[in-house]
């Protein structure tokens, strides 16, 4: 297998026309699923449909050979470790990993070293992305400073922040959280909470339950998440124009609270990771610290609740929480090892398990990976529409392969999915009309 990458830079050159023919074109938002062709010019989609338009005057023709041509995936939760931990990941290597996984837009979390809590650092991140990324890079900025005061949220939004979070840590102070929610409502951006009450979880390594007891390891109480979710919903329920987003939800009790909030008409959204709807705490016995993440893998009841939440719409989207770590950070006892796993190159096939197993329809699964996350951060992507950005992927839905972490483009290889057999493979990734990743057998 030969893989080729190109930096995004300014995207496809102006006026350059590419015809994608013999494709199964899927757009989850409009429920489009047709055999046809699609035309891009420069960085935009200009035409698509069932009729085979003439390819005369086209600069390049790509025969899709009946494969699925769909919007690029959008992952609103990644850690690219730049600045500060470039030995684990960089924007360059992280975006290579994204491209190989069919992810055309990522949202970087701000818990870098130093954290993205100032306009200077926000501009640095955007500059590095323009210089070294293969895909579109958006970012959250921090809610609080090191002094536990609110950041300059209006200025950070002006500098490009699509929302605010202290991900990696929760906003523990309820007054600070209330102020953040109020300010964000004026700015029209979400507050994204890492929902964890540290008073209930501090010092824990894995889910508190039968496995933590068996291994003699301090656990993280499931209620540490749901207590924080309930607190924040109470704080925002009487505010106008506020958007509260829960990162990497993992417990059934949290979903119950989110459903109640949605039923009341509150603007509450949430995401789930593939590992939380495919794995349980039981695999910690097999994989040890490689299966350590925060929030931790929980029970089968919680896992099934995640699947049900995706099916019913209580869970709005799928996001990876791509958290790269070098080997020395993971080759430690459970209590001392770093939290997190990589996920960009496994998000699509793991999500497609919901389709291949008959639990969800194809368009419903793909919606959680495309326009639904785009809507949470208010960007016009994740769709096939005329005059929108030509962010596209070509996917072989039925290609069977085995996940091998040694083949990941990410600088880090920390994944408990090594050796898992999956279906669904990205053949080509296009961003702003430019092929930035392709794979040939």
UniProtKB/Swiss-Prot annotation:
GO annotations of cellular component type: cytoplasm
Cofactor: Zn(2+)
Cofactor: how bound: Binds 2 Zn(2+) ions per subunit.
Pathway membership: Pyrimidine metabolism; UMP biosynthesis via de novo pathway; (S)-dihydroorotate from bicarbonate: step 3/3
Catalytic site positions: 321
Signal peptide region: none
Keywords: Hydrolase, Metal-binding, Pyrimidine biosynthesis, Zinc
Residues that coordinate or bind Zn(2+) 1: 77, 79, 167, 321
Recorded family membership: Belongs to the metallo-dependent hydrolases superfamily. DHOase family. Class I DHOase subfamily.
The protein's name in its UniProt record: Dihydroorotase
Gene name linked to the record: pyrC
């Amino acid at each position: 297998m030969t893989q080729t990458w190109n930096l995004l830079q300014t995207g496809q050159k102006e006026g350059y026309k590419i015809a994608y023919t013999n494709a199964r074109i899927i757009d989850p938002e409009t429920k489009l699923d047709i055999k046809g062709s699609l035309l891009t010019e420069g960085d935009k989609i200009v035409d698509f449909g069932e009729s085979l338009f003439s390819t005369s005057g086209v600069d390049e023709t790509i025969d899709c050979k009946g494969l699925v041509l769909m919007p690029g995936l959008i992952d609103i939760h990644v850690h690219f470790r730049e600045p500060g931990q470039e030995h684990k990941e960089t924007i360059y290597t992280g975006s290579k990993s994204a491209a190989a996984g069919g992810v055309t837009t990522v949202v970087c979390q701000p818990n870098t070293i130093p954290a993205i809590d100032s306009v200077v650092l926000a501009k640095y991140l955007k500059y590095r992305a323009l210089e070294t990324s293969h895909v579109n890079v958006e970012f959250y900025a921090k809610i609080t400073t090191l002094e536990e005061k609110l950041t300059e949220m209006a200025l950070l939004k002006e500098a490009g922040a699509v929302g605010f979070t202290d991900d990696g840590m929760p906003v523990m102070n309820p007054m600070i959280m209330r102020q953040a929610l109020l300010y964000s409502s004026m700015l029209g951006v979400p507050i994204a909470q890492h929902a964890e009450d540290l008073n209930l979880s501090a010092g824990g390594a894995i889910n508190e339950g039968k496995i933590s007891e068996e291994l003699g390891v301090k656990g993280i109480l499931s209620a540490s998440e749901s207590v924080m979710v309930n607190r924040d919903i109470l704080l925002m329920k009487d505010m106008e124009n506020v958007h509260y987003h829960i990162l990497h939800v993992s417990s059934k009790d949290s979903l119950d609270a989110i459903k109640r909030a949605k039923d009341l008409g509150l603007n509450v959204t949430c995401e789930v990771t593939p590992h939380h709807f495919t794995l349980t705490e039981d695999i910690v016995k097999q994989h040890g610290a490689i299966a350590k993440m925060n929030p931790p893998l929980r029970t089968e009841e919680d896992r099934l609740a995640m699947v049900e939440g995706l099916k019913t719409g209580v869970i709005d989207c799928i996001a990876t929480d791509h958290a790269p770590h070098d080997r020395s950070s993971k080759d430690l006892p459970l209590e001392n090892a770093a939290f997190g796993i990589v996920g960009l190159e496994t998000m699509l096939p793991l999500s497609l398990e919901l389709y291949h197993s008959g639990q969800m329809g194809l368009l419903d699964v793909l919606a959680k990976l495309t326009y639904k996350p785009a809507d949470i951060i208010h960007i016009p992507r994740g769709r096939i529409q005329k005059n929108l950005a030509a962010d596209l992927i070509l996917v072989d839905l039925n290609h069977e392969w085995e996940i091998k972490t040694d083949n990941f483009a990410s600088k880090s290889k920390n994944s408990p999915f090594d050796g898992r057999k999956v279906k669904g493979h990205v053949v080509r990734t296009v961003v702003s009309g430019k092929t930035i990743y392709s794979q040939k057998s």
